[in-house]
Amino acid sequence: MQADCTFCQIVSGELPADLVDEDERTMAFMDISPATLGHVLVVPRRHASDVMSADVEDWLAVAATARRMARWVVGAFRAGGVDLVQANSDGSVGNQTMFHLHVHVLPRYHDDRLGTWWSPETADPSEITEAARRLVDYGRSDPEATEPLASTAT
């Protein structure tokens, strides 16, 4: 637990939250500033500032709980679908303000005001191939990488 972390304080019971679900690794509770009706946050019980520093098993548990919450919010609120949002930044990009790994489960409705995250435009194929090559090259030094790495980007 990190003393100055709001989500750690919720996990420990120091701060109240409208708890929806919990298991040995995760908690799911209602967002106090919801983007849409039924907006749920899923957090690991153990503090990790972001997905890159989280224990793999904690991340998998968060993903499983987020998947379950997605089913629940679609069923309970008759949402048309969900967005799962997980931000990792130092706060200077992406508007992240809570530095405890969490996933937003955002029910989507035809009349919500969330819009789209980006305007998809087809990129130059050579730029896509170069980006893939850079990722594979970087991935070769990652101790968590699994073989075989993609061969199309070599």
Where are these regions (language model features)?
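HIT superfamily nucleotide-processing domains
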Residues: 1-154
